[in-house]
Amino acid sequence: MENKILVETSARHVHVTQETLEVLFGAGHQLECRKELSQPGQFASTDRVTVIGYNKKDPNGPRPQAALSILGPVRDHNQVEVSFTDARQLGLEAPVRESGDIKGSGKCTLKGPAGEVDLEEGVIVAKRHIHMTPEDAEAFGVENGQNVAVLVEGQGGRMTVFCDTVVRVSPKYKLAMHIDTDESNACCGSGTIYGQLVSLEGDCDCDCEGEGHDGEGCCCGHHHHHE
């Protein structure tokens, strides 16, 4: 696979502020690293927090909940990232957003051993994205904030194209694409898998003559690579 990009599955998790962390776990509490993540300086902490959703069938019944890992370091806002499947199971409203874009997003309750915090916003389904350094972006011919299509080859030869994947560029990043667990299941994303940027427009190898069966784009499986 040419110009391959490592594809990683990002399972549900929580980011918190230091203030929220101390409400949940007690004054002066600090996150401790359990496992370093692929992005420099990021880590899965030893702490887990209970995310409490809403019982939509019976508002007076027990509220669904799940324990999620807290990722570090602490941030300047609280954010809960789940898949659509998680959101349904927990009765949460979770719009697709880029990380940090939480205004008007879903609400929930966070519960720790020392206290609870009601979040009026912050629950999202993270938009699939690619972390790139400026050098990576130049090599791939893309810009920060650009939406691209990525062909991912999962296990068992399952080929899946993920459109509307946003490119995020920073010298602090390391090249990797992040998808959630729903997307990973769709492409049989177990183990180490890779993707490559493709174009959905251009010369087509089937009889739609490059206009797709809906009149737009390329519909065949032979997608055209960005040079």
Model-assigned labels for residue ranges:
Residues E116, G154-R158, L200-D203:
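Short, charged beta-turn/beta-strand-edge "cap" motif at the junction between a beta-strand
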